[in-house]
Design a protein with these regions (language model features):
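Structured C-terminal helix/loop/strand segments within mature extracytoplasmic catalytic/sensor domains
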Residues: 23-33, 139-140, 144, 191-219, ...
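Soluble periplasmic/extracytoplasmic beta-strand elements of cell-envelope proteins
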Residues: 42-46, 54, 70, 91, ...
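Mid-domain, small-residue-enriched loop/turn segments at the edges of structured enzyme/sensor domains
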Residues: 40, 135-197
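Conserved catalytic neighborhood of penicillin-recognizing serine enzymes
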Residues: 97-135
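Active-site SXXK
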Residues: 62-92, 125, 265
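Bacterial Sec-dependent N-terminal signal peptides
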Residues: 1-25
């Protein structure tokens, strides 16, 4: 047998072993970061669409506003089925701009009685995590049931979207009803990047909106500042529950490196007893470790 052919066959045989060892090393590093933290922390990383690393994935994590990404996909599907573009105008009454919730949309248009496009509303939800814009989109596109049903149609199962932002605001315990495992959310992002879910104009709009996200700069994006990496992400932030714990501090996104490597990363932190700053720092530390590992170790 030709020596080069033999070496090639041997390489194919040992490559899975090398890959397993490398991903095991990353998992150990991530476990080291979260050890001793006063919170339930779940992590999922998908490298180049293939190798997967998870930590504490078998738990229901409240998504908080990360579910607005799920909603955006369902809105795109709704628009395609109805023959609507994201330029389609939506009339918004003053009563829909609730005063007791986070809403840059309401702050800009406090009197309501305005018309904005579906795309503008999606920018408010994906860029700024606007709660009123989210519930307006739910109202116009079939509610949480439609979003839940659409995501399930993609083959995603370990999640649930049952309540609106207004319902969560009225009952903090309802936040736990919109949940997901980290890996299921990572799979959704992978689908957005690699599959033709709907028309390219819808798909590009959502990925571009994730890249220009303005929230959570102290989380996944923080250690990537000053690098040439491109990150798109969606954050989620909860209030404190009756025990004084932060219900959810989350970030879910994708990173494209200059060397052509790509990875999806999701970090969900549930019931944190740490400070808000320290909880966000955990996500940043995880992001830094994954970035360093993939950009330098996997050559």
């Amino acid at each position: 047998m030709n020596i080069n052919k033999l070496l090639f066959i041997l390489w194919l045989l040992i490559l899975p072993v090398i890959t397993l060892a490398e991903t095991s090393s990353l998992k150990e590093q991530l476990q080291g970061i979260i050890g001793g933290k006063k919170a339930q922390i779940g992590i999922a990383v998908i490298i180049n669409g293939k190798d997967t690393v998870t930590v504490n994935n078998d738990c229901r994590y409240p998504m908080m506003s990360v579910f607005k990404l799920h909603q955006a996909l369902a809105v795109a599907d709704y628009c395609q089925r109805k023959g609507l573009s994201f330029d389609t105008s939506v009339h918004i009454d003053r009563a829909e701009l609730k005063t007791d919730t986070y809403s840059p949309l309401r702050d800009k248009y406090p009197q309501g009685n305005i018309a904005l496009s579906i795309g503008e509303l999606l920018k408010y939800t994906l860029h700024l995590s606007d709660n009123n814009a989210c519930d307006i989109l739910f109202d116009r596109t079939g509610g949480t049931e439609t979003t839940d049903k659409y995501i399930r149609s993609l083959g995603i199962g370990h999640f649930s979207i049952e309540v609106t932002e207004d319902e969560m605001h009225k009952d903090l315990n309802a936040c736990y009803r919109n949940w997901s495992t980290p890996l299921e959310t990572a799979k959704i992002i992978e689908m957005l990047l690699t599959q033709e879910l709907f028309g390219k104009e819808y798909q590009n709009f959502i990925t571009d909106a994730m890249i220009t996200c303005q929230t959570g700069k102290d989380r996944l994006a923080y250690p990537l500042e000053g690098t040439n990496a491109i990150i798109g992400h969606k954050t989620g932030t909860g209030d404190r529950n009756s025990k004084g714990q932060i219900i959810g501090t989350n970030d879910a996104g994708f990173v494209c490196l200059p060397n052509g490597k790509r990875y999806t990363i999701v970090v969900f932190i549930k019931d944190s007893e740490e400070t808000e700053q320290a909880t966000s720092r955990i996500i940043a530390d995880i992001s830094e470790t994954v970035y360093r590992y993939i950009s330098t170790s996997l050559q």
